[in-house]
Amino acid sequence: LKSAYLMADAIFLIDNQRYVKKNAPIMNNMAAINARVVEPFYNLLCAGEETSQKYIGSKILDAGDIIQTLAGWTIIGQGKSPTPPRGFFSKEKHDFRDRMTETSKGTHAMDEALGELSLTCEPKDAGRALYLLTAPPKEMNMEIIKELGDNLKAMAPNALIRSGDYPRQKSSLDVTVILSELNSVRKITNYFTKALDLISMIKAKQGLEYSSRKLEETFSDIPVLL
């Protein structure tokens, strides 16, 4: 982890255990885990490369936005809200209640994305973030996009937030969220702490002194694989 952190611009952290199904065969688990790991990236990577005019959003989230967002420890999540099919007899104009329902679907998808992050973290620790709304064109409006931005800002008040929309989805309203430049990730801190404890034990057995210091001060003591 330290070696990758020092060399890479950003590292996506994914906890496989979050996707493990109890009593499922190992091979089935691995296939399901891999599928769930890559799923949130699909809309994110397609939105900025879309060539069909009818699928280009009002605010495009392209590779430049993604690159500007990614830094250091990074976590991704995705949430979905089903949308009812709109047939020939469906209303063309939405009233206030329809718009409220659509906004609540967006909020639900955002909450699910933050609840299904690839690794448990505190959103308030993020320095950068982005969200992408993917939905049928008729399910999108500026109220939803603004509501999503307000919700994410409330959860990640210290983050510089980028956003975009992708009017391509057919049967659901999807929200993809990235939290990046995380200044504290408990699981990573635990790994580094255990590594330093092991180094301390080894030095003690060798008769070497190893003073007690803060984690930030002892980070350099962890060897790298470079």
Predicted regions: what they are:
Residues 1-226:
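Tubulin/FtsZ superfamily GTPase core signature
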